[in-house]
Amino acid sequence: MNDARKKLYISDVTLRDGSHAIRHQYSIANVKAIAAALDRAGVDSIEVAHGDGIEGSSFNYGFGAHSDVEWIEAAAASVKHAKIATLLIPGIGTIHDLRNAYDAGARVVRVATHCTEADVSRQHLEYAREIGMDPVGFLMMSHMTTPQKLAEQAKLMESYGATCVYVVDSGGALGMNDIRDRFRAFKEALKPETQTGMHAHHNLSLGVANSLVAVEEGCDRIDASLAGMGAGAGNAPLEVFIAAAERQGWHHGCDLYGLMDAADDIVRPLQDRPVRVDRETLALGYAGVYSSFLRHAERAADKYGLKTVDILVELGRRKMVGGQEDMIVDVALDLLKSAEHERTHAEPTMSEAGR
């Protein structure tokens, strides 16, 4: 259970996960303003990168307005207290890219893998520790395996040097009891000194609730973003989580009103698509789909005259995971072909029409 005297580690992800919400188009001025506001408000770390992690800028994931190094340097120059964090997905970013991020000012790295593939994080976690970074394990799509198997993967990351391992609800598909079960499994499997973290998405409107439950189960680090800025329906809104934590009497060290101002005055105006629970983002949580698929699926739906929800539900049925963004167009074409087949067979033949 949570010790109310314990200082929660507040990890902001507006400048990384939030990048998905605007197709990775943060300007340097945006980064500086957001990082400075977060630093003044007292968060512990500020994650900065392309939405898909360092070196994610590509045809497959979407090109960023700037390089990760440029974003990280801008954020690092704008803070006095908060640590700059970044995210690396093995296979997208390399240890050489991680070194570049470190030289630019990043001091925390979250090495992200699919929830059953922790073994691919070893090289990156060990290297991060070697160069003096805080190495964190990040188990994405945590709803796609059992609590016990997830804990086994967390144990692997711990053995590679991770100081903290996250339950990552990439699809926003986990319920509150699912969160309890996973953190209890972590507690049984991990060493007492290894911290745990929660990264929620708000697709079922449970981002804040799940984060609160995680803390009740002893979670040390909470991810959240200003105005919920993130993939899909967004992450747990930082200002909302802090307000709820304050009402619980928990020690978070943040300026609530400063966060509220930053969310409404700086971040929300940047959204070209509202970050909210709606028909499409709800489908992500319902079908258990990777939240960053949203904008890609919307683009495919618009191009081929389909419903975004139909594409997302089919992606969920096929159990597509992060890194398979290129398959979204294939799924759209399959749905289009199926619809044309049904339409052709539904039309009466000439002989039937003449009866």
Swiss-Prot record:
One Pfam assignment: DmpG_comm
Entry keywords, A to Z: Aromatic hydrocarbons catabolism, Lyase, Manganese, Metal-binding
Tagged with keyword Lyase: yes
GO molecular function: 2-isopropylmalate synthase activity; 4-hydroxy-2-oxovalerate aldolase activity; manganese ion binding
Occurrences of domain Pyruvate carboxyltransferase (ranges): 8-260
Residue sites binding Mn(2+) per the record: D17, H199, H201
Group of enzyme by EC: lyase
Residues annotated as site: Transition state stabilizer: R16
CDD domains in the cross-refs: DRE_TIM_HOA (cd07943)
EC number in record: 4.1.3.39
Family recorded in the similarity comment: Belongs to the 4-hydroxy-2-oxovalerate aldolase family.
InterPro entries: 2-IPM_HCS-like (IPR050073), 4OH_2_O-val_aldolase (IPR017629), Aldolase_TIM (IPR013785), DmpG_comm (IPR012425), DRE_TIM_HOA (IPR035685), PYR_CT (IPR000891)
Protein name: 4-hydroxy-2-oxovalerate aldolase 1
Record keyword Lyase present: yes
Residues annotated as the enzyme's active site: H20 (proton acceptor)
Swiss-Prot/TrEMBL catalytic activity: (S)-4-hydroxy-2-oxopentanoate = acetaldehyde + pyruvate
GO biological process, one term: L-leucine biosynthetic process
Binding, substrate: R16, D17, S170, H199, Y290
Matches recorded under NCBIfam families: 4OH_2_O_val_ald, PRK08195.1
